[in-house]
Amino acid sequence: MIPDVSQALAWLEKHPQALKGIQRGLERETLRVNADGTLATTGHPEALGSALTHKWITTDFAEALLEFITPVDGDIQHMLTFMRDLHRYTARKLGDERMWPLSMPCYIAEGQDIELAQYGTSNTGRFKTLYREGLKNRYGALMQTISGVHYNFSLPMAFWQAKCGVTEGDAAKEKISAGYFRLIRNYYRFGWVIPYLFGASPAICSSFLQGKPTTLPFEKTDCGMYYLPYATSLRLSDLGYTNKSQSNLGITFNDLHEYVAGLKRAIKTPSEEYVQIGLEKDGKRLQINSNVLQIENELYAPIRPKRVTRSGESPSDALLRGGIEYIEVRSLDINPFSPIGVDEQQVRFLDLFMVWCVLADAPEMSSSELLCTRANWNRVILEGRKPGLTLGIGCETAQFPLPKVGKDLFRDLRRVAQTLDSIHGGEDYQKVCDELVACFDNPELTFSARILRSMIDTGIGGTGKAFGEAYRNLLREEPLEILQEEEFIAERDASVRRQQEIEAADTEPFAAWLAKHD
């Protein structure tokens, strides 16, 4: 089932320096909650500056949903320590609030009024909040409070020069983009390994079912928690953050122009369902528009091709201008065993897996084949630890035992690990392979099995409160290592100034501005 990568691995072993200079970045979302686990109803803390313009700390869907962003970094330890500093500083500024340590929220009642993230009075800020109003009216606010970690990854130019002989210019743009699309196609085929190892949402609170009937064979605990005994990541299931209405968009990952055309089609195609919502009610705007996607970022995907945008540029126009610059992996649950929601083992594994995905052959995939890959993901998401579980290849009927496929994959990853360790010294990458490959023979070692044991004992709420309290105490006590308090204060003040400048520069009423930007 695993493609034959022996030639590509032999090439890599002859060109180890091609992997010198991998760049990464992390984003982590987390809800601000009160001591009893309920959602904080306070505004974004003043000490954290402007959520619109702060470089490192912003908000996602809700005013209480923090998002931490590291700068691009070539050093794993430095990146994780930077992320930890963001958490340390924030923990000191949250008063009695703490950060929820799980992907799935708990103490949010069905229909509870969740305040949308606020970004001030500028047209840009109001647009961001209106987009979130549209998300709420389309999918419900509860789904949008699910948190995750995003891992951004790019290969050095030296890799593309050695592998594809690229120099600068348009030909390089096309070849590099084609390489990243190969990575994405392999991710769709084999990325289920991420929720298998690191999924940490095997259970949900009853409010998530919102009274809707479900065919899933949930078991229920006395405290009202629903769980599937072999599930890994219900966050990635249809109960979590996915979007069924997008599954027939026909967006593919074979070619840059084809991909962008599919994206642009989706933001221009009206949706019968969203037309029903309407654009306004009682003078209040309900969504940016009634198209399948309000804006490109609404496309739900487990992985995205990205390029840093220029001012006023859409993500797809940035891709057309310069090609794919980096990849955003979006399938990581919050790691509940880390105070910052992610750890070094995960980052090193993702490095290895991304390199493998770019080396392995990946035939082009039609949109129907892409849908077939979803079957393996769903199987792993809902029953990944089930004894005897098998996986298929694309739309074919042949089935293979998951543990065998996992161990075959790790045989390749270990060779990538040896190459990366030869560049950096030590055996850190190989050690990660040894630790994680054991999860295929013993699923009890996976994140989902470990966290489920705690959740069955104390419920999602009890687990979340206990871990959140422990991390709050730990982070508040730890000294800052990279950033200093003065730098946080300077960025707070600068971000507020930047927001004020944007607001002062606006001359157009929002309705007129929106008409031009929709």
Curated annotation (Swiss-Prot):
UniProt keyword list:
ATP-binding, Glutathione biosynthesis, Ligase, Nucleotide-binding
Q: Gene3D superfamilies given for it? A: 3.30.590.20
Which reactions are catalysed by this chain? L-cysteine + L-glutamate + ATP = gamma-L-glutamyl-L-cysteine + ADP + phosphate + H(+)
* An annotated Gene Ontology molecular function: ATP binding
Q: Domain of life of the organism in this record? A: Bacteria
- EC numbers: 6.3.2.2
What's any one GO cellular component for it? cytosol
Q: Does the keyword Ligase apply?
A: yes
InterPro entries, per database record: Gln_synth/guanido_kin_cat_dom, Glu_cys_ligase, Glut_cys_ligase
Q: Which NCBIfam families match?
A: glu_cys_ligase
- HAMAP family, sorted: Glu_cys_ligase
The similarity comment for this entry is: Belongs to the glutamate--cysteine ligase type 1 family. Type 1 subfamily.
Instruction: Report the protein name in the record.
Output: Glutamate--cysteine ligase
